Curated annotation (Swiss-Prot):
Organism: Salinispora arenicola (strain CNS-205)
Recorded name of the encoding gene: obg
Main location: cytoplasm
Name this polypeptide is given: GTPase Obg
Domain called OBG-type G: residue spans: 160-330
Residues bound to Mg(2+): 173, 193
Ribonucleoprotein keyword on record: no
GO BP annotations, alphabetical order: ribosome biogenesis
PANTHER family: DEVELOPMENTALLY REGULATED GTP-BINDING PROTEIN-RELATED, MITOCHONDRIAL RIBOSOME-ASSOCIATED GTPASE 2
Length: 481
């Protein structure tokens, strides 16, 4: 049964926002109680948090579908809907979050680091929140926004100070088992280790972690022998230690050729050229092993490697190797920038939601793209004429109509915003559109507000009784003569 998983694809669905409520307050002796529809609750979000007690992505391998709860709808009497519960997924230290296309969204390193990978939908406003001086009793409310929906790839890259690299059966697992408390599986056949093993080493005043990376073979950088999956775990290592088998029975192999082959794979993988290296010539307790180590040692030292002759079985030479590891780790930590103690919650990149663009589509339609217009479209109930009118007013205030006119759009053209398409008829003609202002076909003559003189004349006509003479605008009185 699989016990270690370092790559999974999660199908994430954040919660949808609850719809706003349309309600009018009803109470005895209050005929005009006003709107009291509450707002919808926000949908739950999906977040990833680093937990030091988690070491594998195994749980997500069996449960890849994740969905947060939706927000509740608003209700009358100004009752807001409850927010959906946020869903927190615990991941190992060193988890990289990517899109299916390979774009890195977050690199989670450090206990408590949190990334909001899918944000819950915003709850719709009720008619009480939409009321203003002009619109005293709205007969509509906003719909809740749908939550984010995406597929995310989680990859685990082990966080260790030192990585042990080498051919299969070079003795890497045996070495980590004697210098730390790690208990990896050890056997006398290749590829016994199929998953990275981590161990903590304490020597002198230094404490560091060591990763036993599964064996590499020529072609690993191109994926041969699961090499890409194994090489991923050495990316974060500050120091690399070549573990070389000096007692191999393969006539075509020798320690120098093994190191050259592994170095070629590390170079092909990329990004590891600046890591300091050590060489551990292992199995010198085996007959002819010590002789071969002494033969190749001068050649390796001439290449700039620090070479140690060791035996994981008898523990010979391990103390010197561990001290050298500690020195290199201390130097790497001193050169690294200081780590902030406060864990910051990483959120998706903010956008300028006030901006929008207008472009002509190949099919002749005009496409409006922008965070606000698209969000307003999602929040509008198109079965409610008043809600559609409110949307038109908001788009006009944002400048969408003006920009469409300047781009060359004509009345009746097809306009596409988000997933909605409609025929465009500007609310009012402006100076950039030829014609009389107010000549919109949707505006009837009866909707024009009468002048003050017309209103005064109409009031006098209503007050005049049949048979009475028309009222004079002049005041009657004595002339004083």
């Amino acid at each position: 049964m699989t016990t270690f998983v370092d790559r999974v694809v999660l199908h994430l669905q954040a919660g949808d926002g609850g719809h706003g409520c349309v309600s009018i307050h009803r109470e005895k002796f209050k005929p005009f109680g006003g709107p009291d529809g509450g707002n919808g609750g926000h949908g739950g979000s999906v977040s990833l948090v680093v937990d030091p007690q988690v070491h594998t992505l195994l749980d997500f391998h069996f449960r890849p579908h994740v969905k947060a709860s939706n927000g509740k709808g608003g209700a009358g009497s100004n009752r807001d809907g409850a927010n959906g519960a946020d869903l927190v997924l615990r991941v190992p230290n060193g988890t990289v979050v990517q899109t299916t296309g390979g774009t890195v969204l977050a690199d989670l390193v450090g206990a408590g680091t949190t990334f909001e990978v899918a944000r819950g939908g915003r709850g719709g406003r009720g008619n009480a929140a939409l009321a203003n001086a002009r619109r005293k009793a709205p007969g509509f409310a906003e719909l809740g926004e749908p939550g984010d929906k995406l597929d995310a790839v989680l990859e685990l890259k082990s966080v260790a100070d030192i990585g042990l690299v080498g051919y299969p059966s070079a003795g890497k697992s045996s070495l980590i088992s004697v210098i730390s408390a790690a208990k990896p599986k050890i056997a006398d056949y290749p590829f016994t280790t199929l998953v990275p093993n981590l161990g903590v080493v304490r020597v002198d005043n230094h404490t560091f972690t060591v990763a036993d990376v599964p064996g590499l073979i020529p072609g690993a950088a191109t994926g041969k022998g699961l090499g890409l999956e194994f090489l991923r775990h050495v990316e974060r290592c500050a120091v690399l230690v070549h573990v070389v088998d000096t007692a191999t029975l393969e006539t075509a192999r020798d320690p120098v050729a093994d190191i050259d082959a592994i170095e070629a794979e590390l170079t092909a993988y990329g990004g590891l050229a600046d890591r300091p290296r050590l060489v551990a010539l292992n199995k010198i307790d085996v007959p002819d092993g010590r002789d071969l180590a002494e033969i190749v040692r001068p050649d390796l030292e001439a290449r700039g490697f620090r070479v140690f002759e060791v035996s994981a079985a008898t523990r010979e030479g391990l103390k010197e190797l561990m001290f050298a590891m500690g020195e290199l780790v201390a130097a790497a930590r001193a050169a690294a920038p200081p780590v902030e103690p406060t864990r910051i919650v990483i959120r998706p990149k903010a956008v300028d939601d006030a901006g929008f663009t207008v472009e002509a589509a190949p099919d002749g339609a005009w496409v409006v793209r922008g965070t606000r217009p698209e969000r307003w479209i999602r929040q509008t109930n198109f079965d409610n004429e008043e809600a559609v009118g409110y949307l038109a007013d908001r788009l006009a205030r944002l400048g969408v109509e003006e920009k469409l006119g300047k781009a060359g759009a004509q009345a009746g053209d097809l306009v596409r915003i988000g997933e909605r398409e409609f025929d465009w008829h500007p609310t009012l003609y402006a100076e950039f559109v030829p014609g009389v202002r107010g000549g919109d076909q949707r505006l009837a003559e009866k909707t024009q507000r009468p002048s003050a003189a017309e209103r005064l004349a109409a009031r006098k006509a209503r007050r005049q009784r049949p048979g009475d003479e028309p009222e004079s605008d002049e005041l009657d009185g004595d002339s004083g003569e």
